[in-house]
Amino acid sequence: MCNCQDFCRSLIRVFLVVALAVGGPPVQGAEVTLAQAVLALEASLAANPVAKAAGANATMRYAEGLVASALAVFEQSRHLDKPYFHRSEGIDGRAGLYNPDNLYSTALVTDQGRYRIRGRRGSHVMLTLQTLDTYPNVGLGRNLSVIDLDAMGIKPGESFELLLGGARQADRWVPLPAGTRALLARQTFSDWEQQTPTTLSIERLDREAPRLDSSVPWRTAADYLQASERTWNEGYLPMIQRLPENRLLPPRASDTGTGGLGGQQSVMARYRLRSDQALLIKVRKSDARYQGIQLGDPWFVTPNYVDHQVSLTSAQAVIDADGYLRFVISLTDPGVANWLDPAGFAEGYVFMRWQGLARPLADDEAPTAELVDLADLSARLPATTRRVTQDERNDQLLRRQWVPIRRLP
């Protein structure tokens, strides 16, 4: 069971330090509301059975991630007249199973505002912009629209401008749907070593936003924590815990009604393994612009994906001669190239994604899963399966240091 009360109290002090840095403490009552939200989060995590399965360290990182996101929302909500893209940072602890193959950047906006986005397109495989009716990760908000910047003909290396909101413009203009509160930019990479990121900036073109009462950002941060606790700990986690263990359901379109990316198909499953077992996943290499698989811990959080090979794209993985990708999930290294390392978690989640498909996946393209004894794994794999030595495994991990998050200027 995680006892993170001292940690949570220290987070309250962090918020107070921020308040002093930006021009004085919060108004009376705002601090109490935030303190209550942080301590309520601590109590919720400590009482949740998931804390036992995840362990104290993972639970602490999860709490850190939620509060760090609240701090980002606090800061952004102070600057609605001068918005900016906030890049999600860190390599673990972020709620909602962040995809290691994506760079996520968020900006807070209003549906009545007019904005200009400037950027220079990188060479990564996909670039989308979603309009959401809630702050990202505050809840499973609705995905109001998806803007595919690649469909606008923006090529790698090209500088571009995009106008949002207000009256219709002649070129590269998109409306902001009623209820829009945030933009989520998503850059998807299939080759971490070779592909480059897109640079993005945003400015507000219309009148300045109304001056906020000084308590609003604080209450917004408190609302974030309270909504996150309801969304993940009380809502989403109990739902996905009902998924069958070690079995894959058919691919489905992502639910844009809960903030998912439109045009994506996905498979989510639970795994549970003993130390002498492996889960063998077999899937056909598709013609999707992006195809990837990743693991999540019991909190539905991506483990440290730099020091552990918790994810692979179809470009990173070895494709067998029959056109299939075979991934092995096991607590110990089985010596195959396509090992997915659960980072010590004996139970957790598997998530597979296909983006940019020319057509929906056919029934025979659905992935399969087989639970096997580690001693029998070799017999279940093709004779030509790529094996790796410890030095080669170390080299794989060394190459993962070229994560997109470290390649931004």
Task: Identify the residue ranges that each predicted region occupies.
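A compositional/structural signature for long, glycine/proline-rich flexible linkers
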Residues: 28-409
